[in-house]
Amino acid sequence: MSISIAAIILAAGRGERAGSPHKIPKQYRLLGKKPIIYHTVCRFLRHPAITTIILVIHPEDRQICEQALAEFKERFIIVEGGSTRQISTLHGLQALKKFNPQYVHIHDGARPFIENELLDNIHNTLTPQEGVLPVLPISDTLKRVNHQYVLETIPRTHLYSAQTPQCFPFEPILAAHKQAKRVCKEDFTDDCAIAEWFGLPMRTIPGDPHNIKITWHKDFDTAHLYLQKKMQMFPDIRVGNGYDVHSFEEGDFLILCGIRIPFHKKLNGHSDADVALHALTDALLATRGAGDIGTHFPPSDPQWKNVSSEIFLRHALSLLKQAGGRIANVDITVIAENPKIGPYRHAMIENLMTILAITPDRISIKATTNERLGFIGRGEGIAALATASVLYPGEIPQ
């Protein structure tokens, strides 16, 4: 039987220790090309066991938060936090009450590298009577210091550093937070401490050394290096395909890849009927999951009558650039009995080089016949297939 597991992501802090030069809270500073909170939220969104996500933010951060997470706006709930972490957590728990989850993760918004493996290990350890805490053994020698002098060395045996997410049965941790508020107990540094105080047992599991919390300015350097390494290991390369077909009508030229080709017929279409650029536009849109050319430029709209298909291609390209995409290569196959494409291939490649800003070795344009089969074989029209490979920032999700 499946269980319902929610997540509360705490992002209401000001992050003064991280030292932002632009006074931007650290969770909204860029890591790679996306804010830290974007990376954190993504980790929970992509895990199939997480049913509900509550994002607790500072009241002044709603606009910047909504901008940072615009593409996910339907997939999480924003709750305003309080003056302390403990109060913010209670706000998140109270907002979750109507969803009645069985368990809840409570996670620091400034820990962007939580992996599915750790979440799975937590879920496999859950019971209705216990919470789960990921921990790491302390490797440094610990000293108790007073006024810059060492008082004693503290044995490391049985000492661990705590990470988040910390996961709890929902009702007990909500009750613990409510009880702490009632008795004005406000000095807890994490939710595990509240659970301990309330009498809820906490079982530990091995944490992940890469699951760092970005607290100090130097932590950004560590995070950037780790992200770069991850991107090199699992680059987010996406492949899109496009297909288009247009019939012939009377005319004296047609346009392919933006190049005018003399012919005794032209292609019938609402725009200039550049079947090759239409297929390529669809291929590029596919890498963003952005629909097809008809979604953006409906043929029922008279403003696109007889316009150059380069407009459509440049629009798709702008969507790629907004997401930080870079074209790795494009491949177009024109399927036609006539006209012959060979004499115009070089001009087509040069035109695409200009539009796409890529080198010719990343552009393939070729043609084939349909061996006189079907409507293409009968010379009734032209079809085109296109494939595009685009590299986006970030890594491939697990």
Swiss-Prot record:
HAMAP family: IspD, IspDF, IspF. The gene is ispDF. This is Bifunctional enzyme IspD/IspF. The record marks 156, 213 as: Positions MEP for the nucleophilic attack. It catalyses: 2-C-methyl-D-erythritol 4-phosphate + CTP + H(+) = 4-CDP-2-C-methyl-D-erythritol + diphosphate; 4-CDP-2-C-methyl-D-erythritol 2-phosphate = 2-C-methyl-D-erythritol 2,4-cyclic diphosphate + CMP. Residues 238-398 are annotated as: 2-C-methyl-D-erythritol 2,4-cyclodiphosphate synthase. One of its GO terms (molecular function) is metal ion binding. It comes from Bartonella tribocorum (strain CIP 105476 / IBS 506). Residues 1-237 are annotated as: 2-C-methyl-D-erythritol 4-phosphate cytidylyltransferase. Bifunctional enzyme that catalyzes the formation of 4-diphosphocytidyl-2-C-methyl-D-erythritol from CTP and 2-C-methyl-D-erythritol 4-phosphate (MEP) (IspD), and catalyzes the conversion of 4-diphosphocytidyl-2-C-methyl-D-erythritol 2-phosphate (CDP-ME2P) to 2-C-methyl-D-erythritol 2,4-cyclodiphosphate (ME-CPP) with a corresponding release of cytidine 5-monophosphate (CMP) (IspF). InterPro entries: IspD, IspD/F, IspD/TarI, MECDP_synthase, MECDP_synthase_CS, MECDP_synthase_sf, Nucleotide-diphossugar_trans. Pfam families: IspD (PF01128), YgbB (PF02542). Its EC number is 2.7.7.60, 4.6.1.12. Pathway: Isoprenoid biosynthesis; isopentenyl diphosphate biosynthesis via DXP pathway; isopentenyl diphosphate from 1-deoxy-D-xylulose 5-phosphate: step 2/6; Isoprenoid biosynthesis; isopentenyl diphosphate biosynthesis via DXP pathway; isopentenyl diphosphate from 1-deoxy-D-xylulose 5-phosphate: step 4/6.
